[in-house]
Amino acid sequence: NSLIPFTYGGGVYAIPETLSFPILFYRTDILAELGIEVPKTWDDVTEMIVDLSHNNMQFGFAGSLQNFATMLYQNNGKVYSDDATASAFNENEAITAFEKYTKLYQYFKIPVTFEFANRFRNGQMPIAVADYMQYNTLRIFASEIDGLWSIAPVPGTMRSDGTINRTVVGTATGCIMIKGTKNKESAWKFMQWWTSADIQEQYGKKVEEKLGASARYAAANAVALEHLPWSYEFYNELSSQIKNVTCIPEVPGGYFTSRHFSNAFRKVIYQNENPRETLLEYTKEINAEITDKRNEFGLTTGGKGH
């Protein structure tokens, strides 16, 4: 799935190099003291938020397109139409997910933004969804709580068959070859060599030898990532989450998606606007830009939302 943001129109335009994705961090000592179990679903989360608030504590889940898309995919929605010509935010799955997502901030008052490491360290936020590479920060910045925290998969959405959809949205970087490259064969061999499991593993370990645990490398190569010096407990949970990582596709004009999602989100949170109507309003703006860019690039324009 780390290929998704580099795939368009049947072509693949990069080889994944790094992959970051969210995981659930929690303070084992504080949750045990409060008698709170690690939440498995978002329904569990809302129940837990009430218990945390009674103790002047918070649950962390930042307001962002990436986090909304996690809930969207868990509810069988998508960011763009199947033909990649329009936003899918006007579909019922997206509207339902947006209503659930904004409710966390409107009614349960979780913070839109926060500084994770400090709040997690001092116990104000004993449980939060954050990028798994925050592991690096906590190992160095919060060494005094070593052994007092752990990770688990991000809470999911219950399916009709009783299983839990644990999909999360990650972000990837990739290696590309410039179109005008003179030595294409040599460049291609280098890209294959650089992104291979052995070399990515060696690179990750050498960087960590030089800079310490805070420099743990977010390899997109799953084999290389597995062979980095994780503890058994940490990697066991990490590998469980990796199986459910997806990425948001890239489309012409797609930069308006994050911009207008943010506009819609903040309008609902800060101005108490109707989630459905607000999302539909900004979806029109997203689609207008996608249409303009498709016209600019000479692509066939059509599909839903135009």
Task: Describe the predicted segments one by one.
Residues 1-22, 46, 149-155, 227, ...:
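Hinge/lid segment of periplasmic solute-binding proteins
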